[in-house]
Swiss-Prot record:
Lineage: Eukaryota, Metazoa, Chordata, Craniata, Vertebrata
PANTHER family per the UniProt record, alphabetical: CADHERIN-87A (PTHR24028), PROTOCADHERIN ALPHA-4 (PTHR24028:SF133)
Domain of life: Eukaryota
Organism per entry: Pan troglodytes (Chimpanzee)
SMART domains to which the protein is assigned, alphabetical: CA
Main location: membrane
Cytoplasmic-facing ranges: 719-947
Comp. bias regions, Basic and acidic residues: 906-920
Task performed by this protein: Calcium-dependent cell-adhesion protein involved in cells self-recognition and non-self discrimination. Thereby, it is involved in the establishment and maintenance of specific neuronal connections in the brain.
Record's protein name: Protocadherin alpha-4
Length: 947
């Protein structure tokens, strides 16, 4: 054969066409090989690994394997060189019977990732089977009266091969009576017969021996023979004849037994017994046909007597002969072709080829989970199978190859929502009614650490009494993780920071597994009121996830500090205070004031004063204010009173149990002409206006100098602390001593170790500077007042009832407070907040300075809030100082008191916020009212209480 190439352009087109065909087959995922049947073991078939595009080194790691349907082991792959070879004997006739096409279908499966390739190996036929006749000898009885050209059917030979190897040619041994009629193209293979060419003469030749030879088309040719023994009969001249020589019938599979297939009819021109016909199956039909069908010998009806299955056989060929009853019976023949029609009687078959389980919850979309193979033995629409999946699941089925589906991930997974899926795959054919089959698979979702531990709330408030034993359990934190196994194993730890000069871990610890929080040392309310820190919960996943929770531990106060006496300004030996009192003083004259502080808070720091009875039961003309500590006279003094008195004042707090301290005051009675101590509260004798003015100026200068000095000192100290403080958040340190505020109606005692003691992790505490200016007339007004003896009082201004102390001012207040209504403790996210109502009355108490105690024990005075209700405090006269003013930047209130001669000064408290309106109002007073106001001042000796 010669090939003549045209132009170069045609060559390129042909080459491009071949490349496109190769690429199409490669993309289709199929390979085609061919091998001859009966090939020896080890015969080379093809380089399958190379043709699939796989490297030899990855065959074993990717679990390269070959699977075939039905018959395994015929072909195998050498994993060392990737060659497909013959492993065992291949017999095409056994494998495919007489099918025109015979292939071995292989499935090549590799993992990581999962891939499936289809390989078809065509089995080529070789001429290894000779033609075979049903019998080696056939006997024929032919009447001598048969006319010429009579036809006598013969059973042809069969060849197990196909194609040209099964293409048979027949030849008859030479004779003068018969010739061989070969089948034409439009007839079936078995249309072979003898044609009578010369009349028979029984007397001349009673028997005729012929040999029929069948030769196939293979190379080399193979032959088969059958001996024909023809017996010449005498008499009956007419044989039965059927209406048609070939009948074709369609029959549904699965029809019940007794179903009529066809009714045959044959006729015989003879009469009598020679014309009676008996129907029967030819002896040449297979036993399988005889087991499926039955023919009635009289009527010629063929009925079903066995199970007809389309999948077993698609058609049946039945040879029927009609024989008359003549002495020399004659026969006629016909063929019945029964074509079986398919019925949808087979359910689809499902099989999971490969599973990749469990699947991670973070698997990307499109991940292949399983490979599903479906098949149906029916044909046509009845064998067309479609698959469906359970609805409302994050998976879908994707058709990959013919009768193959891939189960892939369609949407994101969340193990915390659904940890496993029960999937049901339904395969349904296209028949009517449709048949279906199901297969289920459980898909477990593997956990991924995608959930951090979560606390029930972002922060907790814990209350712990001070002086707790070391190692006591104060709280338990608990976090929950929605993940599983190690990803849900939660451990707890502290977020380390510094509290003052010490590490947080020296105060508290947390158990890593249980989350229990322990106090490692006794807590001191006076040192640390609030300890704020964070606890971290972290799981054991990779990478680990964590979250924090804030704990606010409030240290509750206990009465563990006794009242402490403050040194008197005049001093006294042995802790005793000495006072000189004129004999001429009247009732309620203030002799001295006992000052005490308590480091505790609330009721534990609320102090009361009691005067111990004198020795021998003698009555003494003095009393002490229950809450003010002021010692005053109960009556006018006379000669019966002792000139010296030793007073014992018991200072007691309101804790449980109460703690006490005792102060000693030595009172000496002197004549009016003797000068009393400067510390005395009362001035004896009448002092003129000039002397009073001098005293006022002296006290004013002292106060201004003290305030200025304290302000400068506070600013310097604050600057030094800010510069030297370590850059730690939430540091706490003991504060500096504070001052004491006192008046005739009560005493406010402040801890000597106080600073804002609330520790948190949000930054250093803020410093609130609040300036309270005393309501004093300016220098110009004072000069005008020195030139006149008339004084005027301005109208009293009421403080703002909504005013509150600042945070730094409240943090330093730890003493008894002049209040009469109950306080309310409210616990919020930032800690307890106590509000104390105001004093509702400014009437002097029956006993100097006594007030009703606040309701509720254990209240933290650091969070007291003072309200000043409506009242009528008296305005300070000219040259007088207000009772109190507050040093900026300090929680202390300074008491400055000036008493005119023979009278008791008014006790009015003034708190202003930088406003200097009092002096302006004094200028606007009319001079006509000065005389009347002076008279009212002289007659008024009543003290007003703080509002």
């Amino acid at each position: 054969m010669e090939f003549s190439w045209g132009s170069g352009q045609e060559s390129r087109r042909l080459l491009l066409l071949l490349l496109l065909l190769s690429a199409w087959e490669a993309g289709n995922g199929q390979l085609h090989y061919s091998v001859s049947e009966e090939a020896k073991h080890g015969t080379f078939v093809g380089r399958i690994a190379q043709d699939l595009g796989l490297e030899l080194a990855e065959l074993v790691p990717r679990l390269f394997r070959v699977a075939s349907k039905g018959r395994g082991g015929l072909l195998e792959v050498n994993l060392q060189n990737g060659i497909l070879f013959v492993n065992s004997r291949i017999d095409r006739e056994e494998l495919c019977r007489r099918s025109a096409e015979c292939s071995i279908h292989l499935e090549v499966i590799v993992d990581r990732p999962l891939q499936v390739f289809h390989v078809d190996v065509e089995v080529r036929d070789i001429n290894d089977n000779p033609p075979v006749f049903p019998a080696t000898q056939k006997n024929l009885s032919i009447a001598e009266s048969r006319p010429l050209d009579s036809r006598f059917p013969l059973e042809g030979a069969s060849d197990a091969d196909i194609g040209e190897n099964a293409l048979l040619t027949y030849r008859l041994s030479p004779n003068e009576y018969f010739s061989l009629e070969k089948p034409s193209d439009d007839e079936l293979v078995k249309g072979l017969g003898l044609i009578l060419r010369k009349s028979l003469d029984r007397e001349e030749a009673p028997e005729i021996f012929l040999v029929l030879t069948a030769t196939d088309g293979g190379k080399p040719e193979l032959t088969g023979t059958v001996q024909l023994l023809i017996t010449v009969l005498d008499a009956n001249d007419n044989a039965p004849a059927f209406d048609r020589t070939i009948y074709k019938v369609r029959l549904l599979e699965n029809v019940p037994n007794g179903t009529l297939v066809i009714k045959l009819n044959a006729s015989d021109l003879d009469e009598g017994l020679n014309g009676d016909i008996i129907y029967s199956f030819s002896n040449d039909i297979s036993p399988n046909v005889k087991s499926k069908f039955h023919i009635d010998p009289i009527t010629g009806q063929i009925i079903v007597k066995g199970y007809i299955d389309f999948e077993e056989s698609k058609s049946y060929e039945i040879i029927v002969e009609g024989i008359d009853k003549g002495q020399l019976p004659l026969s006629g023949h016909c063929r019945v072709i029964v074509e079986v029609e398919d019925n949808n009687d087979n359910v689809p078959d499902l099989e999971f080829k490969s599973l990749s389980l469990p699947i991670r919850e973070d698997a990307p979309l499109g991940t292949v989970i399983a490979l599903i193979s479906v098949s149906d033995k029916d044909m046509g629409v009845n064998g067309l199978v479609t698959c469906s999946l359970t609805s409302h699941v994050p998976f879908k089925l994707v058709s990959t190859f013919k009768n193959y589906y891939s189960l892939v991930l369609d949407s994101a997974l969340d193990r915390e929502s659904v940890s496993a899926y029960e999937l049901v795959v339904t395969a349904r054919d296209g028949g009517s009614p449709s048949l279906w089959a199901t297969a289920s698979v459980s898909v477990e979702v593997a956990d991924v650490n995608d959930n951090a531990p979560a606390f029930a709330q972002p922060e907790y408030t814990v209350f712990v009494k001070e002086n707790n034993p070391p190692g006591c359990h104060i709280f338990t934190v608990s976090a929950w993780d929605a993940d599983a196994q190690e990803n849900a194993l939660v451990s707890y730890s502290l977020v380390e920071r510094r509290v003052g000069e010490r590490a947080l871990s020296s105060y508290v610890s947390v158990h890593a597994e249980s989350g229990k929080v322990y106090a490692l040392q006794p807590l001191d309310h006076e040192e640390l009121e609030l300890l704020q820190f964070q606890v971290t919960a972290r799981d054991a996943g990779v990478p680990p996830l964590g979250s924090n929770v804030t704990l606010q531990v409030f240290v509750l106060d206990e009465n563990d500090n006794a009242p402490a006496l403050l040194a008197h300004r005049a001093g006294g030996t042995g802790g005793a205070v000495s006072e000189l009192v004129p004999w001429s003083v009247g009732v309620d004259h203030v002799v001295a004031k006992v000052r005490a502080v308590d480091a505790d808070s609330g009721y534990n720091a609320w102090l009361s004063y009691e005067l111990q009875p004198g020795t021998g039961g003698a009555r003494i003309p003095f009393r002490v204010g229950l809450y003010t500590g002021e010692i005053s006279t109960t009556r006018a003094l006379d000669e019966t009173d002792a000139p010296r008195h030793r007073l014992l004042v018991l200072v007691k707090d309101h804790g449980e149990p109460a703690l006490t301290a005792t102060a000693t005051v030595l009172v000496s009675l002197v004549e009016s002409g003797q000068a009393p101590k400067a510390s005395s509260r009362a001035l004896v004798g009448a002092v003129g206006p000039d002397a009073a003015l001098v005293d006022v100026n002296v006290y004013l200068i002292i106060a201004i100098c003290a305030v200025s000095s304290l302000l400068v000192l506070t600013l310097l100290l604050y600057t030094a602390l800010r510069c030297s403080a370590p850059p730690t958040e939430g540091a706490c340190a003991p504060g500096k001593p504070t001052l004491v505020c006192s008046s005739a109606v009560g005493s406010w005692s402040y801890s000597q170790q106080r600073r804002p003691r609330v520790c948190s992790g949000e930054g250093p505490p803020k410093t609130d500077l609040m300036a309270f200016s005393p309501s004093l007339p300016d220098s110009r007004d004072r000069e005008d007042e020195l030139q006149t003896t008339e004084e005027s009082f301005a109208k009293p201004r009421q403080p703002n009832p909504d005013w509150r102390y600042s945070a730094s001012l409240r943090a330093g207040m730890h003493s008894s407070v002049h209040l009469e209504e109950a306080g309310i403790l409210r616990a919020g996210p930032g800690g307890p907040d106590q509000q104390w109502p105001t004093v509702s009355s400014a009437t002097p108490e029956p006993e100097a300075g006594e007030v009703s105690p606040p309701v509720g024990a254990g209240v933290n005075s650091n969070s007291w809030t003072f309200k000043y209700g409506p009242g009528n405090p008296k305005q300070s006269g000219p040259g007088e100082l207000p009772d109190k003013f507050i040093i900026p930047g300090s929680p202390a209130i300074i008491s400055i008191r000036q008493e005119p001669a023979n009278s008791q000064i008014d006790k009015s408290d003034f708190i202003t916020f930088g406003k200097k309106e009092e002096t302006k109002k004094k200028k606007k007073k009319k001079k006509g009212n000065k005389t009347q106001e002076k008279k009212e001042k002289g007659n008024s000796t009543t003290d007003n209480s703080d509002q």
